[in-house]
Curated annotation (Swiss-Prot):
Keywords: Cell cycle, Cell division, Cell membrane, Cell shape, Cell wall biogenesis/degradation, Glycosyltransferase, Membrane, Peptidoglycan synthesis, Transferase. The gene is murG. It is found in: Cell membrane. Pathway: Cell wall biogenesis; peptidoglycan biosynthesis. SUPFAM superfamilies: UDP-Glycosyltransferase/glycogen phosphorylase. One of its GO terms (cellular component) is plasma membrane. HAMAP family: MurG. GO terms for biological process: carbohydrate metabolic process; cell division; cell wall organization; lipid glycosylation; peptidoglycan biosynthetic process; regulation of cell shape. This is UDP-N-acetylglucosamine--N-acetylmuramyl-(pentapeptide) pyrophosphoryl-undecaprenol N-acetylglucosamine transferase. Cell wall formation. Catalyzes the transfer of a GlcNAc subunit on undecaprenyl-pyrophosphoryl-MurNAc-pentapeptide (lipid intermediate I) to form undecaprenyl-pyrophosphoryl-MurNAc-(pentapeptide)GlcNAc (lipid intermediate II).
């Protein structure tokens, strides 16, 4: 079988695709893959490192306001469809899977015109513009949140979950916290604002720092590279020298860390949600206000409804509120266990299997 995968722009579109590819490689080693992205997108750095054949087309996104740039966008979209058709004819895939981003719009639409079976994978609780456009043309639509089904044709839509969820459940308990100077036997909260960090979360952590004194739990905080030096300088002048806190610029083995902690605090991106729910980890989510259609708030609300997470709006985040929310969960074993059970219930630990079954129905 030959599978062409396309998606890009953000890690939320790329990492689920890579998790799926790795799963299929184990299940059916003879399967051939080709990943189509853009030369300037994050995928151009990540996919080749994963040793997956990679080709590019040139495309850009629409401006949401009236802009002459949109004429160029339309031109690039039309020319990219022709380029995508050329790539598809050369590779001759049995199925094409789009995981989001403008590049998948051109490639999946081109595959539809060439009468090749197509699937789109929607990670969020509100669909992106590309997947809304493609939904009328594709054969199947794989979703991660039941709520998003209402945006798509019922007969095409299947709840598969996010392949990242299946990848993380294989991670075992370890003493990884000792690598950060923390005690693996103590309750621990991991706090982060995404790969680049988040200013509001950073400010709240700085306010919260002295409040963590004499807590029974530990705090592992990933500030993001761009805030790390500034934060270190600020904390240097703090009167408190706390041994139950570790501050890192970035945590490379985040999934392994989450598998060995008791609570996660961070943004409400689809990939993070797939990971911590698969692990059955309770969370405090601070949705980013800077994403399209405010989809992170919708992602978080779907989990608040079932009691798996608590949500703090970005505009309301302070150090005191952050510590109070962490205390309320980590110092209350019954509540933490109830949230963990609810989180596990929302996880889909066989997401790659489910998506692979959808592929096999089309081939």
């Amino acid at each position: 079988m030959k599978i062409l995968v396309t998606g890009g722009g953000t890690g939320g579109h790329i990492y689920p695709a890579l998790s799926f590819v790795e799963h299929v490689k184990k299940e059916a080693p003879a399967t051939e893959f080709l990943y189509v992205g853009t030369e300037n997108g994050l995928e151009s750095q990540i996919v080749p490192k994963a040793k997956i054949p990679f080709k590019t087309i040139k495309i850009q996104g629409f401006k949401r306001s009236l802009s002459p740039q949109n004429f160029k966008t339309i031109y690039l979209f039309l020319t990219s469809i022709n380029k995508a058709k050329k790539i598809i004819r050369e590779f001759q895939p049995d199925v094409v899977i789009g995981t989001g981003g403008y590049v998948s719009g051109a490639v999946v639409y081109a595959a539809h015109q060439l009468k090749i079976p197509t699937i789109i994978h929607e990670q969020n609780s509100i669909p992106g513009m590309t997947n809304k456009f493609l939904s009328r043309y594709v054969d199947k639509i794989a979703i991660c949140f039941p709520d998003v089904a209402s945006f798509f044709p019922k007969e095409k839509t299947i709840l598969t979950g996010n392949p990242r969820g299946q990848e993380v459940v294989t991670v075992e308990k370890s003493a990884i916290l000792s690598e950060f100077g923390l005690d693996p036997a103590k309750k621990t909260v991991v706090l982060f604002g995404g790969s680049r960090g988040a200013l509001k979360i950073n400010q709240a952590f700085e306010q919260a720092f002295p409040l963590f004194e004499e807590r029974e739990y530990q705090v592992l905080y990933a500030s993001g590279e761009r805030y790390y030096q500034e934060l270190q300088e600020s904390l240097k002048f703090s009167e408190k020298k706390l041994t139950n806190i570790s501050v890192q610029p970035y945590i490379d083995k985040m999934v392994e860390v989450m598998a060995n902690t008791d609570l996660m605090v961070g943004r409400a991106g689809a990939t993070s949600i797939a990971e911590f729910t698969a692990l059955g980890l309770p969370a405090i989510l601070i949705p980013s206000p800077y994403v399209t259609n405010d989809h992170q708030t919708k992602n978080a609300q779907s989990l608040v409804k079932v009691g798996a997470v608590e949500m703090i709006p970005d505009a309301e985040l302070t150090g005191a509120r952050l510590v109070a929310a962490i205390d309320d969960i980590l110092l209350n074993n019954e509540k933490r266990q109830q949230m963990a059970t609810a989180s596990k219930g929302e996880g889909i630990p066989d997401a790659s299997d489910r998506l692979y079954q959808v592929v096999k129905t089309l081939v």
